[in-house]
Amino acid sequence: MASTSRGEEKKKIKLKITKNKMITVFVIIAAVAVAYIYALYVPKPVYSVDYRGIILNFRVDLREANKIPVEPGPDQVYTELINPLVKNITIVYKPTGDPDEDKYYSLAAFEIAEKLKLGMLARTIYDVGIDAKPLSEFNRTDYVNLPGKIQHPLIAVIHPIYANQTRVFAAPGHVIYIEATSYEGFDLAIAKFLISALKIKF
């Protein structure tokens, strides 16, 4: 009788161990499957792209930047700048009077000019100059009625101090506005402008 009950206890213990092992194996397989599906289907951040053989590196995730609205649409930004009539592009800004805040303009102007130049080189466009000037160079104190031309479009970069929305706006009169109400939005809007201007795919 005692040996029979011991045998039954051993079977129960083995059965419990086997069930626990099966549950553990099942949990591990399920976790691996979930991780694989996540890695396969959840988009990863994009910080660099191969643009016609030239690597363009960005400071922000292009997937996030792509959510910034472009008015009336990305094609208007592209056709304004990638145009055989364009000879010069000027980045226009309104100084804040604070050197720390104005650093954002320097960073924005550098990123825009560098990426546009590289993008144009990739498209074999060699004769377009890009520079940056304060509004005072155009006898203006604000961004209204900027004198853009088809041969000389303007990119008006609006600091978060002055902006009341976050967007890229291709306005009539050959002026493209980049504006944002936050510093993060400012960086994203600049990236969205470049995505639109160069038709970057990722």
Predicted feature residues:
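Secretory targeting signatures
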Residues: 1-50
